[in-house]
Amino acid sequence: MKRFPVTLTRRTLLASAAAVLVAAPLPTLAQTAWPTKPVKIVVPFAPGGTTDILARVVANELTKAFGQPFVVDNRAGAGGNFGSDIVAKAAPDVYALLMGTVGTHGINKALYNKLSFDPVKDFTPITLVAGVPNVMVLNADKARALGITSVADFITYAKANPGKLNMASSGNGTAIHMAGELFKAMTGTYMLHFPYRGSGPALMDMVGGSMD
């Protein structure tokens, strides 16, 4: 995918915030120094995951750049739809931005029959923050017990033991979930899917041994 550099300036952020805060009158915002109060960055997943970590880095830099606190607000649920809905329907006097993902603004539109918001019309993109690869990991103790040292070993075991391995994801419809389903389809394997409210809790359970 070709990426175009985007410079995040006060004018750019002001225009995009006005578009996200759809009820805010543009003339008023244009005449007012922005922001005049703290700004909420909604992360539609649980703390500790990639989206949350990136949001906190961005919030720290924006706080220094604009002189007002940018505060991360985790609102997990429904594969990112819960937090996205909060920002889409934010009141005019609320400064709210969303740290969206390919899941919240791409996959969910196709996955859910009806969303309470329009991921295109109710938001204006500001900038691409990061491109994040998907990585498959297996609990270390489980890998040693099963003698799995490679992806090929993993596929061989999964094919021979359908349903005996479980797969944690950051939520139904997320990019991680879709990547896992694609892996199963491409390899002819079957693993039980357990959706979490973010990659942070999923990773903790995988390290703890309750997830493979």
Each language-model region and where it sits:
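N-terminal secretory signal peptides
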Residues: M1-L8, A15-A24
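Short, well-ordered beta-strand elements
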Residues: K37-F45, V71, A96, K164-A168
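Extracytoplasmic "Venus flytrap"
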Residues: I41-L54, A76-A78, S169-T174
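Sec/Tat signal peptide C-region and signal peptidase I cleavage site
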Residues: L26-A30
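Hinge/capping helix and adjacent helix->loop/strand transition within the periplasmic-binding protein
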Residues: K89-Y95, A110-P201
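Short, hydrophobic alpha-helical packing/hinge segments within bilobed ligand-binding/sensory domains
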Residues: N81-S84, A202-L203
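Short, polar/charged alpha-helical segment
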Residues: G48-G67, H177-A185
